[in-house]
Amino acid sequence: IPIENTKEIYCMNEVTVNTKLLDFLSQNHVIVHFFNYYEGYSGTFYPKNQYNSGRLIVKQVQAYDNSREVIAKAIVCGIGRNIYEVLYHYYKHDKKEVKEVLDWIRREFYVKVENAQNVKEIMAAEGEVWMRFYGTFRYFLPEDFVMNKRVKRPPDNPINALISYGNTLLYTKTISAIYQTHLDQRISFLHEPSEGRFSLSLDMSEVFKPVIVYRTIFDLVNNRKLQVEKHFDKKVNYCLLNEEGRKIFIEAFQARMESVFVHDRLKRKVTYRTALKLDCYKLIKYILEGQEF
């Protein structure tokens, strides 16, 4: 594997590493993401940052103090737009039951976000749009994959297992994207900055969950590429993808990241991987120059 073409490594099984390897990876700015037995994210080897910018860090902190709600609202509105896009796809294919949620997003959701007075109210609007989205799954997914409620650690059924795994993969992709910018991973706007996680990656990945994670899941499930009896290990209180299921999901996830769409602002085709990085640069433009985010 040519090191020059490698940006990140994913360790999905037990591995042994030494300092010589870590030093080599650091010199070549390669990020390593580690996962545990339960398919959960364990952590990231994050090489010395080559893109440090003291000026941007100062401005990012100032934006947290002065513009947090503005940025958080932009993120949550982006989530709503992408959920709308996913549901409209099914509405066009005769799943008319989703119209109620589409109408709610168009008529009420954006008003609710705009009228929110603080981050807590913004997150309440975000929580509501996700819950309404989950409620539509029964209209276009097989019965085996219908969600009763969102359960994360550990996931308790196949659909929760897929969502948790997909969200984790997207989170790590976002960590890698932000690493290539001057942004500080620790200073977030929608999620509360906290110790032990890159909270800005949580912010920036949220917008893309509907169009990357959920579209990947829906396509795999509805085309029967993932099946409950063949691709999951279910225990008493948790459910996980088996090795074959993980391979199928990762392959589809990667394909989705490299698929293209017409970017609203650029008016040209870009991949979702590129769009993720572009959002990071748009945030930088807002922080430094006040350009719309």
Regions found by a protein language model. Name each.
Residues 8-10:
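Alpha-helical/coil-rich non-catalytic "connector" segments in signaling and regulatory proteins
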